[in-house]
């Protein structure tokens, strides 16, 4: 183990931002970059008319709608650390891509709209984080507006999300009367002023909750704050680092992302408390981040990040060792060595060539169709990293095209979008139409839009009479062949070459499972494992 690798791993922080749609996640992403000095002017999401688009929302459909559809990756330096920030799609229809992003991070920042509290998508995403005991930092956003009672919000997080809260800052007022926050651990008051262009050193700080200056500034609010702090300290949890790292307790911060307020405290907490890259499970052994040899896995494939180049980029999370440009690395699923000379790092759509990368870093490998989600890379050791699943889709459409001469483009487009994980593609064993499976309706809209923009294909989706899909496998090849023959009308092959049973309804699935007890029906499948 080299000291250089160990030092670099300790400097890394890799986290994702998770939230329900419209809680202010993309704005917060922008502001974190602004505070770190990575960008000069944050393009807030709402001002679509101004033509200032958020750094992290780059695909055409995102620009039109103001929602993050593809998860973006941004790297920046802050306080002698290298931060890898993964922005995830907040829209509820994108739970699959979001889930996969959460397999590549070591901690998460949960953004809650304080006017609304805990919402459906937040619950889903937190459950995904819980599968891996991911440490969570919480930001209660939008205190410059009228919001719900702060104690009530903490109760809701604890009761619904089943994670204990430890307030680190506490709001003074809200909406028009929002005066700032009190930092409980530092015994400091940060005074709020509206305006999105302010940087951290431009906010006033008053030392001590008993400072007489506070009575002069806002006598009513300060008394209320003192009463609330007494109550909070009696009723809620103190911050405990070990409990945070175990995913059992979340430090809570309050503020207003659009006004740059409360951002620096979050950044500091992620640097000071969030974990450096952790060991990773592979099929043969546990891989430590400070091992000398390079390894990593693909958690996402993005087609056409640059409309000028019809390219695809595979996003790789480095798990161990040191990546150096030009080094030889092995693509383990197809047992092929590649020379990594044109690997890139990201600031959303701005790409730079990578000279070196360490555990926790996200690098982009140009993909000409050989790389799939879940693939592992190493310097030669047969490591297959685990824990990157596909979910059985819940919605299905059959797809046809208006111009039959473009069938090749359609097939190519769907093959690429299927590998990228934008949608699941099934080719029925009988019948010519391809079937698309998704977790939410918006995914179909994205596919329609991308087929038109990127592949020049006008596709029409028709509803398909399918209730759910299950991947099927059986150790007994003879039994599997009998099953295939008897159920040919309901079987299809997915983009990864796996056999799937498309059930028209719940009853049919139940009866088929009873009739064929030797066949295993899977609700999820590992990306890197062929069933």
Curated annotation (Swiss-Prot):
Keyword vocabulary terms for this entry: Cytoplasm, GTP-binding, Nucleotide-binding, Protein biosynthesis
Domain of life: Bacteria
Molecular function GO terms recorded: GTP binding; GTPase activity; translation release factor activity, codon nonspecific; translation release factor activity, codon specific
A GO cellular component entry from the record: cytosol
Gene3D superfamilies: P-loop containing nucleotide triphosphate hydrolases (3.40.50.300), Peptide chain release factor 3, domain III (3.30.70.3280)
Compartments where located: Cytoplasm
Protein name, per record: Peptide chain release factor 3
Organism: Neisseria meningitidis serogroup B (strain ATCC BAA-335 / MC58)
Binding site for GTP: 19-26, 87-91, 141-144
Start and end residues of each tr-type G domain: 10-278
UniProt function note: Increases the formation of ribosomal termination complexes and stimulates activities of RF-1 and RF-2. It binds guanine nucleotides and has strong preference for UGA stop codons. It may interact directly with the ribosome. The stimulation of RF-1 and RF-2 is significantly reduced by GTP and GDP, but not by GMP.
HAMAP family linked: Rel_fac_3 (MF_00072)
SUPFAM superfamilies with a match to the protein in the record: EF-G C-terminal domain-like, P-loop containing nucleoside triphosphate hydrolases, Translation proteins
Alphabetized NCBIfam families for the sequence: prfC, PRK00741.1, small_GTP
Family statement: Belongs to the TRAFAC class translation factor GTPase superfamily. Classic translation factor GTPase family. PrfC subfamily.
InterPro entries the UniProt entry points to: EF-G-like_DII, EFG_III/V, G_TR_CS, P-loop_NTPase, PrfC, RF3_C, RF3_dom_3_sf, RF3_GTP-bd
Transmembrane segment boundaries: none
